Amino acid sequence: MLYQSETLQLHWLENGIAELVFDAPGSVNKLDTKTVANLGEALNVLEKQSELKGLLLRSAKTALIVGADITEFLSLFNAPPEKLHQWLVFANTIFNRLEDLPVPTISAINGYALGGGCECILATDFRIASPEARIGLPETKLGIMPGFGGSVRLPRLLGADSALEIIATGKDVTANDALKIGLVDAVVDPEKLVGSALTMLKQAIDGKLDWQAARRPKLEPLKLNPTEAAMCFTIAKGRVMQVAGKHYPAPLTAVKTIEAAAKFGRTEALNLETNSFVPLAGSNEARALVGIFLNDQYVKAQAKKLSKGVAAPKLAAVLGAGIMGGGIAYQSALKSVPVIMKDINENSLDLGMNEAAKLLNKQLERGKVDGLKMASILATIRPTLDYAGIERAQVIVEAVVENPKVKAAVLAEVEALIGEDTVLASNTSTIPIDQLAKSLKRPENFCGMHFFNPVHRMPLVEIIRGAKTSDKTLAAVVAYATQMGKTPIVVNDCPGFFVNRVLFPYLAGFGMLVRDGGDFHQIDKVMEKQFGWPMGPAYLLDVVGIDTAHHAQAVMAAGFPERMNKDYRDAVDVMFDNQRFGQKNGQGFYRYTQDAKGKPRKENDEQVDKLLAEISQPLQEFSDEDIIARTMIPMINEVVRCLEEGIIASAAEGDMALVYGLGFPPFHGGVFRYLDTLGSANYVEMAQRYAHLGALYHVPAGLRAKAEHNESYYPVSAALLDVSTNQPA
């Protein structure tokens, strides 16, 4: 053994060939600050070996390196910029030393080589992969860009076009695609990976492969003439702005950095990369996006803990077909849980089966399933007009019309037919679970399971705990949601639960703004373009359905009359009274026609302004700041109340529910991250200016206390101040 640390080992293989093996504690290798320092120490030993002829780099685990340790990111980002800069220079010196070894080097890639793992293999002369390998630089998805030379080496290895695509999108590539673009030199069966890597390395040692020629382009300027460069980078910048927009600066920064570095060799190009990385790392967007990644890990860990030792059901059932029931049945069948789909109406069953078939057809078109697989999945959905076989289902999801009497009757009816251990769940969006539980003899076996539309696309499932819901019931439903590929978040019962409870104050703020003379077109534009919502409030209401929103609004007003009751007609009332129900009947705040693919196309409708004139002040222009404040303050206050009342268990779960359930702009990170970025004292001061508008704008006491004590919702990560001093001996 030449060198051994907690994260990697260096030893001789044969005849002057050394092997560097990444083998950190735990299930995966990460390129954390400790591993980077250990790599430097290993190279320090290696550089002293006069008999060294070649180096093979591999992993002892099922993946090479999954990336940096993202749990360290916020601490790194909180370091003073000059400290972070020093550490990046230190880290890049190590990768340069790997690249500059006076012998050929090769990486054997099994599983993932992402982020820093990809940058590590780029520093070797050759790369060989097994078929399941995936290679990529996902940093831009986290609001940053490659920082260990990825933006320098990848374009010089592949050419600018392929490299820009990988870096700007953050998508990884398969082993076969990597071979096509020149990212790897060969793809071999897993059992032959190390042997083939060794063979290739020996060929390089014997002069049969020119390892110096393989290395040279990575040290030199990018080979592009001025015309090619102008075209390549102009097109890339245009695409990035179109896809990422102004709220996500990392992809454009990466493209501009690669462009600026194109005319330089490695040293100057790496300096430019570091100079671009540091400001991105200090940005609010990076903190928010890294926060989402960490929150996602936390939420998934909570689900795993809640359902520990509980298997997903072998058979499920959905009561109520149609689009929603069909969507739930499809998702269940797709993820290998057979499902009974029961309805009292043959047409609804047809609609449900057609929805499942349509979604499977899309999978077929994309090559995700073949015809045989599609048929076998569809065969695991059993449509029925009666309850035959329902007693065999372990979890039953009620998804009938959003009417408390109908839901209660259906739940009581099915409970009489099933065993004492069968779990019942209601896919209700607003009706309190405890209200529905009154119709049941075994309320401990009952909870809410709120799916979001469209089911196949929306990652969140709200699991609602009633007063009598047992832990066993929660565990079964969380296990089922997880098996379905969803992110379950457990919330406590109240009208609207969490997501809809906080959505309707936002929509109420919109309604008041229109009442006071706000133009809904301008409001939508500001909330989409400036704040970053995927849809403005008027457009969202059209998509949800004005009739659905009108009904839910009444439920919320009854549940929280002091804040959500209103003594005036608003824009939703006007649309509802005029039977403008949104996309479902082609007219709401906007008019809808179908495009060539049959998708709804939004158009302005002059009639709407005339209709709204009866309930609103004369049109006036509000500032962007006013529009954002008047719509967002009610939502933010309600989100905070939900945490203070224990409806949600943590800021992390609240923020993920908003991002996954409502499409809250990820670059803000969720309401709690947004508040921390804004500063609670600044928020309270801003909200105070709108307090005259009513109870929705009154800041909760807990948030006022946080503002007084200068507290945040997320712990502030201590800066890693000493990372740049971890120099090899």
Swiss-Prot record:
InterPro entries: 3-OHacyl-CoA_DH_CS, 3-OHacyl-CoA_DH_NAD-bd, 3HC_DH_C, 6-PGluconate_DH-like_C_sf, ClpP/crotonase-like_dom_sf, Enoyl-CoA_hyd/isom_CS, Enoyl-CoA_hydra/iso, FA_oxidation_alpha_subunit
UniProt cross-references to SUPFAM superfamilies, sorted A to Z: 6-phosphogluconate dehydrogenase C-terminal domain-like (SSF48179), ClpP/crotonase (SSF52096), NAD(P)-binding Rossmann-fold domains (SSF51735)
Domain of life the protein comes from: Bacteria
GO terms under cellular component: fatty acid beta-oxidation multienzyme complex
GO molecular function: 3-hydroxybutyryl-CoA epimerase activity; delta(3)-delta(2)-enoyl-CoA isomerase activity; enoyl-CoA hydratase activity; long-chain-3-hydroxyacyl-CoA dehydrogenase activity; NAD+ binding
Positions of the UniProt region annotated as Enoyl-CoA hydratase/isomerase: 1-189
Reaction it catalyzes: a (3S)-3-hydroxyacyl-CoA + NAD(+) = a 3-oxoacyl-CoA + NADH + H(+); a (3S)-3-hydroxyacyl-CoA = a (2E)-enoyl-CoA + H2O; a 4-saturated-(3S)-3-hydroxyacyl-CoA = a (3E)-enoyl-CoA + H2O; (3S)-3-hydroxybutanoyl-CoA = (3R)-3-hydroxybutanoyl-CoA
One Pfam family cited in the UniProt record for this chain: ECH_1
GO biological process: fatty acid beta-oxidation
Positions that bind substrate: D296, N500, Y660
Family, as annotated: In the N-terminal section; belongs to the enoyl-CoA hydratase/isomerase family. In the C-terminal section; belongs to the 3-hydroxyacyl-CoA dehydrogenase family.
Subunit structure: Heterotetramer of two alpha chains (FadB) and two beta chains (FadA).
Name the UniProt record assigns to this protein: Fatty acid oxidation complex subunit alpha
Lineage per the UniProt record: Bacteria, Pseudomonadati, Pseudomonadota, Gammaproteobacteria, Enterobacterales
